[in-house]
Structure formats: structure tokens, C-alpha cells
């Protein structure tokens, strides 16, 4: 009995140590404000960092992809004619995966700008318009397919009536995993075995446990807030966007707000040399915000 009690106490102490709250006041520098890097765009979206810490992002109305070079603090055009890329994420091999919704496609783009169309539809039907994507370490990808009908879509006819979350495995097989009101931002973590997804029109963000390749638990409500884009830091805090950037603890409690002087903040990611600079896409502009915390790998 004593041994069982000791084991139980050791387990409790271990759990408390692992659940110990982060000192959030030390996550961000006092008095530091986001810095606008450029405001020459129409609508910025989909930031994702490469292995060097440079951040690629889209200007969907102008059909371009740019990147922020952290060494020079300059924004450089990467690609014109992107299929109207929206959300992006680098895969394990360093290819930029884009949600190119002009024809309801997902693209794979190399650093030397060679394009491969990975996905055009589901079960023989055109996707509504892939919005955001997260690649896992197995070579698969989770992506959202809401419907935001664009002015530049020519002859569009909705063929899929649901708005859903999908998984495409490394062989190209696509599986519908769940359906939402309007799924949007998505981010995951191999380390935490978690996948987060925003149902923006429902005003909710959900979390799944990742159980295996394309296998998820039942979704659980994470917080009563929808989001356009999202990011995770190494502590498991989730960063949501809309009116600036809202930071939630891994337990779903709002702990911080970063104000951005734009009408809409679309997305956010970590980048820079040490993966500790928040790169924020907001309407016609992009911003950087140095922090004391690093993004999760």
C-alpha cells in the first residue's frame, strides 16, 4: 500500500511539473510593438517559414508569392502566377505547398520555382477552394476546403456541397475527415500530437489528437473563437487571428493580445534565425514582432 501511495505521489508530482503554467509575462518584450515591413500589397495571407527562417506569404488578389528575408529585413517577390495561392506550408522536403484556389488545386513549388499540381479534386469533383494546409512528417497533408467564391473565378460551379477537412497521404489518396460550417485556419504539431482547426463562421476553434497517419480523435472544442489563420509556439500556446493576434494557452484560455493597426489580421507564423519572430499578415501589410518564445517544430 505504501509503495502504491509513493508511486501515485510521484506520478502526481510529475504531472504537475509537466502541466506547470508558463510565465506569460516573459513570453513578450515589454514595450515592443509590431513593426510594419511593407504595405504594398492588396491582401496578404498564408505565411510559412522555410528551414532558414525566411517567411513566404501570398498576395492573393495580385496572384503573387513573396518572401521576407530575415537577414536583410526585406520583402522579395518569389513567384508570379500562383494559381491565386492562399494558405501555404513547407513540407518535410522543403517544397512550398500552396492552396491555389483559382481552379480548386493544391500545388507543390520548389525553390527554383518548378510547379507540380498535387491535387485537383475529390472523388472526381472540383474542390470548393482549398484554404489552408499543414504537412506532417509522414509526407501527408491536412487541408481545409471552405467556400469563398472569388470574383476572379471564371465559370465556377460548386460541385462539392460540404465544407470539410481532408487528408492527402503520401501516395496521393485523399480522405474526408470532418465537415464544418466554414473551415479555415489549420495547424498541427508532431511533438504534441495535436491538430487545430478553425470553424470561422461558427466562431469556434477545435482540437484533435493525432492518432496516426491521417487518423484523428473526435474533435473537442478548444475555444469560442474562430480564426483566419493560426500558429503554435513550443509551449503549445495557440495564436489566432482576426482583430490582431490572440494568444491562447494550451488549455484554451486567452492569455495575451497583440494589437495590429489594420482592419483585419489574416495569419501568423514564427520565423527568423531563431524561430522567435512572429511574422503577421494583415490586409495590405506585413509585420514582424520579436518575442521571447519560439515556434514549435
Residue ranges with predicted function:
Residues 1-22:
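Bacterial Sec-dependent N-terminal signal peptides
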Residues 19-297:
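Sequence-structural signature of mature extracellular/luminal beta-sheet repeat domains
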